[in-house]
Amino acid sequence: MIELKNVSKVFTTKKGNVEALKSTSLQVKKGEVFGIIGYSGAGKSTLIRCVNLLEKPTTGNIIVNSQDLTTLSAKELAKARQKIGMIFQGFNLLKTVTVYENIALPLRLAGISKVEIEKRVEKYLRIVDLFTRKDAYPSELSGGQKQRVAIARALSHEPEVLLSDEATSALDPETTDSILDLLLKINEEIGITILLITHEMNVIQRICDRVAVMEHGAVVESGTVKDIFTNPQHVTTKKFVNSAFAAKIPEDVQKELQTTGEIVTLSFIGNSSGEPALAVATKRFQVYPNILSGNITQLKHEAYGKLIIHMQGEQNEINRALSFLQEQGIIVEGGRTDHGKQVLFG
């Protein structure tokens, strides 16, 4: 559906060239929600703007729906862009016209008939649950409602791809969740492919199927959201994953506890259950675990939990207990054994 091949972007400034996007390749499958996450300056905005050629890449190919956009004429590109919708952090609504006109006007400019425009405006305003506000002006809407209008406007061209450029970053947490639920609904009911960028792990875990992590203009890690959460490799990825959990254990406390046992992280997903398995391990082996911190968060279609425990007992018994937990499908990290590297949390 979307393929970037060795795409780079260099900006020329008074101080010289700035490589905002290094040679990058990635694929987005038809019908999936693909997220790109990174801190400010990572290059994610440049990347997503290259997808529809709002930014023309310095090198590489952008292939959408089997078309290489970098080879198209201006007229051909304009036509191809009609199948690529985009929503932004700032909504970009016309303040002097109604909600209805904000959606209808771009359709008129595209040469859509009046009957078809009326049909589409009603259809997509109903999908975003704003049909009753069709005669309202943007100034009368909340931030979340404005973003819903922007989504309806993007969908009214009936694109096959929807690009989301930090669409929820200006919204409060509750409104963000409602917009994410709407995007997930659109993806599942309409089948539209969504490529989004964000700096918030909550966005990735709630609706994405796969994710790419960016830093300094390059993709440093990518995979399914499940794999990224359960087995992050790059230091930046680990920071994002840890940000989804509230666990912060002071380093001096960790060092003190490590003199009387091991600090271990237990991660479990889906049907695996950390606490019951831990209770069974306590009965089977001579170990004495104390839960220091725990949290369960929701990925797109399943729960993911993490427990940080202090486990006391003889080393052999601890090893046997940790091996048992792994056999139950629980990911074990930390400690002084071969179950994983010692991990500091904080």
From Swiss-Prot:
Keyword ATP-binding: yes
Pfam families xref list: ABC_tran, NIL
GO MF, any single term: ATP hydrolysis activity
Domain ABC transporter: 2-241
SUPFAM superfamilies assigned to the protein according to its UniProt record, in alphabetical order: ACT-like, P-loop containing nucleoside triphosphate hydrolases
Principal subcellular localisation of the protein: membrane
Compartments, as annotated in UniProt: Cell membrane
InterPro entries: AAA+_ATPase, ABC_transporter-like_ATP-bd, ABC_transporter-like_CS, ACT-like_dom_sf, MetN_ABC, MetN_ABC_transporter-like, NIL_domain, P-loop_NTPase
Keyword Nucleotide-binding: yes
Entry's Gene Ontology cellular component terms: plasma membrane
Bilayer topology: Peripheral membrane protein
Catalysed reactions, as listed in the record: L-methionine(out) + ATP + H2O = L-methionine(in) + ADP + phosphate + H(+); D-methionine(out) + ATP + H2O = D-methionine(in) + ADP + phosphate + H(+)
Keywords: Amino-acid transport, ATP-binding, Cell membrane, Membrane, Nucleotide-binding, Translocase, Transport
Positions contributing to ATP binding: G38, Y39, S40, G41, A42, G43, K44, S45
Entry superkingdom: Bacteria
Enzyme class: translocase
Enzyme nomenclature, EC number: 7.4.2.11
Protein family membership: Belongs to the ABC transporter superfamily. Methionine importer (TC 3.A.1.24) family.
Subunit structure: The complex is composed of two ATP-binding proteins (MetN), two transmembrane proteins (MetI) and a solute-binding protein (MetQ).
Protein role: Part of the ABC transporter complex MetNIQ involved in methionine import. Responsible for energy coupling to the transport system.
Protein's UniProt name: Methionine import ATP-binding protein MetN 1
Organism of derivation: Bacillus cereus (strain ATCC 10987 / NRS 248)
